[in-house]
A protein has these predicted regions:
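Conserved short histidine dyad/triad with adjacent acidic residue
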Residues: 22-23, 36-53
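A short, compositionally biased micro-patch
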Residues: 30-32, 43, 53, 61, ...
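Glycine- and acidic-residue-biased ligand/ion/polar-headgroup-sensing regions
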Residues: 55-67, 71
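A cytosolic small-molecule/anion-sensing beta-strand core signal
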Residues: 62-63, 78-79, 97
Length: 107
């Protein structure tokens, strides 16, 4: 079930979170045993350090440019680009500039 989002309206996901100086901001839209969906904003230079997920993680950049390091390989993604980070593989996210992304994890 979706939460923290209006239903039956047209919207832009990137407008669900604002930038905050020196922070990573997140808003969870779905969280259950099978699926997690979260919208993030990263201020320039902010990061989520290396970690692994218990499910396959798909990120789509909604605005700006982010750097994703997956098992040592670097990917620079811009608005509209998507990357799947496999389950149990170390990955990290870094704000090359202010950017927003949607993260969907399937367990």
């Amino acid at each position: 079930m979706y939460k923290n989002i209006e239903k039956q309206v047209s919207l832009k996901l990137k407008n669900l979170v604002d930038y905050q100086k020196g922070q990573v901001v997140s808003k969870t839209l779905v969280q259950n045993e099978q699926l997690s969906m979260t919208i993030f904003s990263f201020d320039k230079g902010e990061e989520i350090s290396t970690h692994a997920s218990g499910g396959d993680a798909m990120v789509t950049v909604l605005e700006g440019t982010g750097r994703f390091t997956v098992n040592g390989e670097v990917f620079i993604l811009s608005e509209g680009e998507t990357l799947i980070m496999p389950k149990d593989i170390p990955h990290a996210v870094y704000g090359e500039e202010q950017f927003k992304m949607q993260l969907t994890v399937s367990f």
